[in-house]
Amino acid sequence: MLCLSLMRIFCSKCLEEQECPLPWELEKYEIWVKKEAETNEKWGEDPYNRPIERLLKYSVINLDKPSGPTSHQVVAWVRDIVGVKAGHGGTLDPKVTGVLPIAIGEATKVLQTLLIAGKEYVALMHLHKEVSEKDIIKVMSKFVGTIIQTPPLRSAVKKRPRKKKVYCIKIIEIDGKDVLFRVSTQGGVYIRKLIHDIGVKLGVGAHMQELRRIKSGPFHENNSVYLQDIVDSLYFWKEEGNEEYIRKVFLPVEEAVKHLKKIYILDSAVAAIVHGANLAVPGIAKLYSNIKKGDLVSIHTLKGELVAIGIALMDSKEMLEKKRGIAVDIERVFMKPGLYPKMWVSQG
């Protein structure tokens, strides 16, 4: 019988050839330069060298959730350890282990971006009767693409059929009635229900034996940390001044938007956006080449700091070629005022 009790080790070492990438990981792009510019080192900060005191109030932890507690309980423990508000980026059932991104302090606002990033799991399905490998492969392949899924009875959302996307299913091993497989999906897909539906389609029934999330958007289990790492990293920083450990645990908030297409702006445009303006074309320094109208994009300084996120009103080519117009409708601002000076001229 297959077992996932050592799934973190198993996944890290044995599944490299069974990758199930998320759509954003497959996108190819270049960085187009619209305007050659440099950033003033007097303003802002290197996001990967933020003062620890600020990092502890504005960061993300790639936590490996243990089996047993609810996601809410885990977040409460982290909040008590750090002494700052916290939130998680996607609920895991108590018995499910794996990647649970936890945002600290002001970084909690970034969690919404993970909803579109997709998830990846390794699951152990137990069939109620033996089925040929050929039939298992044939049926499971039919669940890749757009599926109709009704949330399970115990879920908190309304029990109505929903269209959801399954990006990839790859079978790792079949041992009698047990099927170990890897699956990547958009957010909101219930793997337990997916397995139930596969069992129904096979005509024998099935249930989920064990589940581990190995990826949530840009966060992967390979660089996840345990609850004890949070405690230890804080101790070594406070007692010994060791920053290396704590910087591996408390990641810059910019790590949480790695899956988004990016636009880098001039120093002179930063304060305007921080104070509520949309991003105008003249403020763009460089950008990803694969931006489409309607994409959720992240706006960054030339140092890499996250300024805001918003909806692209132009594609990359238009942003590069046009001299004026609004390029991005800003939805949420992350940067606090004061890090960059105001450089616009007041009217009237």
Swiss-Prot record:
Keywords: Isomerase, tRNA processing
Active site (record annotation): D93
GO molecular function: RNA binding; tRNA pseudouridine(55) synthase activity
Top-level taxon in the UniProt lineage: Archaea
Enzyme class of the recorded protein, top EC level: isomerase
Enzyme Commission code: 5.4.99.25
Catalytic activity: uridine(55) in tRNA = pseudouridine(55) in tRNA
Alphabetical GO biological process terms: box H/ACA sno(s)RNA 3'-end processing; mRNA pseudouridine synthesis; rRNA pseudouridine synthesis; snRNA pseudouridine synthesis; tRNA pseudouridine synthesis
InterPro entries assigned to the protein according to its UniProt record, in alphabetical order: Dyskerin-like (IPR012960), PsdUridine_synth_cat_dom_sf (IPR020103), PsdUridine_synth_N (IPR002501), PUA (IPR002478), PUA-like_sf (IPR015947), PUA_sf (IPR036974), tRNA_PsdUridine_synth_B_fam (IPR004802), TruB_arch (IPR026326)
UniProt-listed SUPFAM superfamilies: Pseudouridine synthase, PUA domain-like
CDD domains: PseudoU_synth_hDyskerin, PUA_Cbf5
Gene3D superfamilies: Pseudouridine synthase, PUA domain
Leader sequence segment: none
NCBIfam families hit by this protein: CBF5, PRK04270.1, unchar_dom_2
UniProt family annotation: Belongs to the pseudouridine synthase TruB family. Type 2 subfamily.
Function, in words: Could be responsible for synthesis of pseudouridine from uracil-55 in the psi GC loop of transfer RNAs.
PANTHER family: CENTROMERE/MICROTUBULE BINDING PROTEIN CBF5 (PTHR23127), H_ACA RIBONUCLEOPROTEIN COMPLEX SUBUNIT DKC1 (PTHR23127:SF0)
Designated name of the protein: Probable tRNA pseudouridine synthase B
Source species of the chain: Nanoarchaeum equitans (strain Kin4-M)
Organismal lineage: Archaea, Nanobdellota, Candidatus Nanoarchaeia, Nanoarchaeales, Nanoarchaeaceae
